[in-house]
Regions:
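Polybasic "coupling" helices that flank or enter modular domains
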Residues: 116-156
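Glycine- and acidic-residue-biased ligand/ion/polar-headgroup-sensing regions
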Residues: 39, 50-61, 65, 75-77
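Cyclic nucleotide-binding regulatory module and flanking cytosolic helices
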Residues: 1-38, 83-86, 117
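Short, small/polar residue-rich loop motifs at catalytic or cofactor-binding pockets
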Residues: 28-29, 47-49
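Cyclic-nucleotide recognition modules
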Residues: 71-127, 134
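Local beta-strand/beta-hairpin segments that build beta-sheet-rich folds
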Residues: 42, 69-71
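Short phosphate-coordinating micro-motif centered on Lys-Gly-acidic
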Residues: 41-47
């Protein structure tokens, strides 16, 4: 990996608290980097890799349903985290390159090696997923609130 790529990866949720260790760098150096053109699907509901993707450069959109943009990803952002260790054969959304992108792909075996070599990265993964669970619980609260005012307050 290039120096700029290492800097970008060191800011992702796995390493943000402690930076890249030598062991982590050695594991990441064995992970593939894929390039995508503007408009190209990186992941789709039916065609995806069982890997966490870390955007090294470019910009991508997370799309749901009929092209509704849920999120915009930039360098250092990730996708595929929640679905990596599941048995589900479908990905939850589409990821499309808005600009040309380069993506580092960390497979489940690579992450397992990383977690064994770098406990802080494992904690970063757990923290990230815990944050997503809390976020989704807040959204559930919004949908199940007994009043319209309560739903709006929780939604905001």
């Amino acid at each position: 990996m290039h120096t700029d790529d290492r800097r970008t990866v060191s800011g992702c949720f796995l390493f943000a608290d402690h930076g890249l260790t030598e062991a982590a760098e050695a594991i990441l150096d064995r992970c593939p980097i894929r390039s995508y053109r503007k408009g190209e699907l990186i992941y789709s509901r039916d065609c995806f890799e069982r890997a966490v993707g870390v955007l090294l450069s470019g910009e991508a959109e997370v799309l749901k349903g009929r092209g509704v943009v849920l999120n915009t990803l930039s360098a250092g952002d990730s996708f595929g985290v929640a679905g990596l260790f599941t048995e589900n054969d479908r990905y939850v959304s589409d990821i499309r390159a808005v600009r040309p992108c380069r993506v580092l792909l960390l497979s489940a075996p690579a992450l397992e090696q990383l977690f064994a070599a770098d406990n802080a990265a494992a904690l970063g993964y757990i923290r990230f997923l815990s944050g997503r669970i809390c976020f989704l619980n807040q959204k559930l609260d919004a949908f199940t609130s007994s009043s319209a005012e309560g739903r709006i307050v929780v939604w905001l």
